[in-house]
C-alpha cells in the first residue's frame, strides 16, 4: 500500500503488487520520500501502480533523524489537512519545494517548517490575517495579540479574547513568513523567544482546525529540547 500526494488528484492510496521484491520494476518507486511520475489505474476501490519514473529521491532524509522527522511531519500535515483526492495545487507546490529545501540544508528547518505551516493554513482555508484587525477591520501595522478563533491580529481597541499575547517581533515574523516564498525565508533572523512563540501559535491552530493533532509534533518538541 502506498500513500501518494499528486499534483492533480490530491492524496491517494495505491497498491503496488510485488513491489517488495528487489527485482520488481516497482521496487524503487515505492521507497519513502520519492518524487516522480507514476502511472496508475483505478480498480474497484484503490488505485494500482503500473509503472513510473523517479525524478528526485529525498532518500538522504531517511538517514538523518532531524530531516526525517521534519519530512514526516510535512507528510502528516498533508494527510490531516486534505480529504482523499482533494486537489490542491498550491499546497502541492509548497510541499515539494519544502522537501527540496530540507534536503539541501540551505535554510533553517525550523524556520522553513513555520513558513510551510502558515501556507498550509492559507491554502486550506484557515489563513491568518495580519493587515487588518479581525474584528473592526481597521488597518494594522503591527499587533501584540493573535485571535486563535478568528485567525488574525487584533488592534488595541478591540477585545482580547480566545487568543494569545505575543511579541510584536513575533507578529512581524508571522506576517513575513506568511507572505514570503519558502526559498526566501532565510532572510529572517529570529530570537529563541520569537521562535517559541511562532511554534506556539502555529501548533495550536493546526491542532485545533484539522481532524486530528499531528503526532510528529511530539518528536519535533523532543528535537528542540
UniProtKB/Swiss-Prot annotation:
GO terms for biological process: DNA recombination; double-strand break repair. Involved in DNA repair and RecF pathway recombination. Keywords: DNA damage, DNA recombination, DNA repair. Belongs to the RecO family. The keyword Thylakoid does not apply. Disulfide bonds: none annotated. This is DNA repair protein RecO. NCBIfam families: reco. SUPFAM superfamilies: ArfGap/RecO-like zinc finger, Nucleic acid-binding proteins. The gene is recO. One of its GO terms (cellular component) is bacterial nucleoid. Pfam families: RecO_C, RecO_N.
